[in-house]
Amino acid sequence: MRTVIFKSCFKDDMQSFMEYRVATFARNTYRLDNYRLSSFDRYLTKISYNDEIVPQTIINQWLNEVGVPEASINGYIKTIRNFMKYRANMGKVVYLPPFQKTKDLYIPYIFSDEELSNIFAIADAYPMTNKFSSIPHTHMEMAVLIRLLYCCGLRLGEALNLKMEHLNLENGVIRIIHSNNKKQRLVPMHETLTNMLKDYCKVIKIYGIDNPFLFPGQSEHLSPITAERQFKKILRKAGIIKGNEDPHKRAPCLHCLRHCFMFHAFKQLETAGYHIDMASPYLSVYCGHESLVESEKYMKFSSELFEEDMLLFADFTESLFPEVDL
């Protein structure tokens, strides 16, 4: 993991804060904090900032210069708030920037059946990685990872954190330990996917190794950044992205496969005769959501494509959470 050398007037506090974070929090949380705080440090160094308290104007100027998308602003603010709380616990006077009210305008990209077929075919024919590479099995890892995300609706972090001990390949069940909500759950797999995982584990030779990651990376598991980079290569080859997209807008990504799973699972349950009020609780538990409100966020698709289904889900959630006169 890359070591950042902080240079601003808060360099010592930043260094000790990151040492605390790496010892206390998950690796991905640490990486995000490290990235955001180092950006903040560079900006403060650039403007020769040297005051004890950082006001809102300086924070806003930093966010504007970095070009943080609206949907990501509160993530950056959260890191700064945690850092300032850390300094406050050391007896220092700080300013805590408030979270900003943002509109969630993000609509996920829903891959068509033809696009999914192309993605799978391209992933299966992915060029073999150089055997001397630090990650020699990337070509096979991506083919399996993509199917796991789409077929089981896993979050990317959940899939990448899987180890052999979390898989029951005899019964076709995955045990999710590293969840967003810190809740464990069991995820059943289709027999076809289970057999693919068996073959994959044999080919990359992770059977018999002391508790290996399902998707080995350079040091631990395959990193989310590497996985997304490889997926974008596949999407470009499939003609789904062209390479000239706005860098500040979210393009199709691996997380879109979880949205695809949610929509197609909902459609299958509806086709099988399950009404929305029966199907939604099952999907909510299966996907590890804390509430049906969280599941509703995954039903944000283009209304032109799925207008009827959007109305069904909206009617259901309105009956669950009626308006209350205050």
Located regions from the model:
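Conserved catalytic core of the tyrosine transesterase superfamily
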Residues: 1-326
